[in-house]
Amino acid sequence: MSNSHPLRPFTAVGEIDHVHILSEHIGALLIGEEYGDVTFVVEKKHFPAHRVILAARCQYFRALLYGGMRESQPEAEIPLQDTTAEAFTMLLRYIYTGRATLTDEKEEVLLDFLSLAHKYGFPELEDSTSEYLCTILNIQNVCMTFDVASLYSLPKLTCMCCMFMDRNAQEVLASDGFLSLSKTALLNIVLRDSFAAPEKDIFLALLNWCKHNAKENHAEIMQAVRLPLMSLTELLNVVRPSGLLSPDAILDAIKVRSESRDMDLNYRGMLIPEENIATMKYGAQVVKGELKSALLDGDTQNYDLDHGFSRHPIDDDCRSGIEIKLGQPSIINHIRLLLWDRDSRSYSYFIEVSMDELDWIRVIDHSHYLCRSWQKLYFPARVCRYIRIVGTHNTVNKIFHIVAFECMFTNKAFTLEKGLIVPLENVATIADCASVIEGVSRSRNALLNGDTKNYDWDSGYTCHQLGSGAIVVQLAQPYIIGSIRLLLWDCDDRSYSYYVEVSTNQQQWTMVADRTKVSCKSWQSVTFERQPASFIRIVGTHNTANEVFHCVHFECPEQQSNQKEDSSEEPGTGDPSTPNQQLDPHAPRAPSASSLPPSPGPNSRSPNQQNQ
């Protein structure tokens, strides 16, 4: 037998959901004037409504219609100002049905609708309308949308408007909407470092705005112009004839321009958060260095001794280097680069940025540290057009090799000390390109794979012979470290003694923990004064069972959230709260040790080191 009823939303057995029918029936009350007990007047148009529905849906109307004021009288007519009939019609439909159609409305109506949602306290409607407005931003509507978003403190819509205006700064300056901006909104736009139009264009647009807004304080507006960024010709032939800036202000700008370092000027730059701008898409190119084409092609897998990298010879005066020119001045605070890592070599280098290729500011200095593979670098935000990477050392030869380069602005929080990152998360992982460069294991990086449960007499640990060698971990780059954590092999009741040293160059070592006279078992938490470290060396000095020191897991800095060991846990199960690390496909693969003891025993020795 056929079913003549319309399709209904699927509901679970035992649940009835007829909300759509309820919405339709209540919405039908808007069509006629039946049962209406209050009337709103907007632009001389009357809107009959129902007090109880309005009060149930909105705290504002509840107070207005049932608060004992004049509007609470029966059959009252309530005039509403500062809105339009079209926007109020949309709001009433939303109140009665929970629905609103935005796609067919003009931007002005949508902004009035957004204002009503804010005024009457409909946060979900406010969010949904803001999200739709984000999708229809264009040169004609972005300024008035930004004005409303700023007025009502709508962070997402405000941010999207700013990003759109930043990427279309010159077009926005020339638009009619720019002249209609409020003074507050205008200053919020042009004071941004990321509003990267030429300063002359900004000055002329502000001059035009002042002519259309004669009652405003023009001096305050003109203070937003960064006069030192303008040329002498522009200052004398464009700014001076306007009469809006004093001769002293112009002379001060000339003085700042002539006496300051170029990189100390308050430049504007393009801001594209969380996206690599060192790409052909954004007009970036390698302008100095050998084999330029490989650096920005995005290929981080297909490289070897002969291809897939850019390079430069390492010389004592550091005149050589690899230089990238960005498509336009940009704001960056994060660089990622991949050093050639098909063997165990390490590099030292520094990175400088510039606007004119004459004045360079050093933002990263790893010239006294040994680094390998992926470098994740952070520094205070800078506006720059040129980036120069200069290699100062290669442990194998006199050539500096880079496989890939990325730069961007990131909103990720980071802490710097002495120019180095102070990590909060464990950086001794395969994904972070850390490596075990000394010590014996069936898999050389088993110590760093995050597995603290699966180990036994035969596998899952790294070891060294007491009195000979050590376990050494190399981090991909120097960090400021103040803690580490170890899991000593604990499948029986043995105990160990050991000490820990750190280094930045494998030459000078600093002892940070001395437990040579302590009986240690299982998990070890080591804290010490924070200091730069690229290498961590763990040296076992005693084992109550045999002549080999065994370590299952290493991390730095210590991850406090992982310290949930159960006192009743069986030996060998490790810490179940520690997640496994995923293998980075770009990380170097370690060869297996040439000689491994069948169980924790005295026959360990260090793996052979490659010298290619």
UniProtKB/Swiss-Prot annotation:
Pfam families documented for this protein: BACK (PF07707), BTB (PF00651), F5_F8_type_C (PF00754)
Lineage top rank: taxon: Eukaryota
Gene Ontology process terms (BP): adult locomotory behavior; circadian behavior; circadian sleep/wake cycle, non-REM sleep; long-term memory; modulation of chemical synaptic transmission; multicellular organismal-level iron ion homeostasis; regulation of synaptic vesicle endocytosis; sensory perception of temperature stimulus
Region (Disordered): 559-612
Domain BTB: 36-104
Residues covered by the BACK domain: 142-240
Record-linked PROSITE patterns: BTB (PS50097)
PANTHER family per record: BTB/POZ DOMAIN-CONTAINING PROTEIN 9 (PTHR46306), BTB_POZ DOMAIN-CONTAINING PROTEIN 9 (PTHR46306:SF1)
Name of the molecule in the record: BTB/POZ domain-containing protein 9
The species this protein was found in: Mus musculus (Mouse)
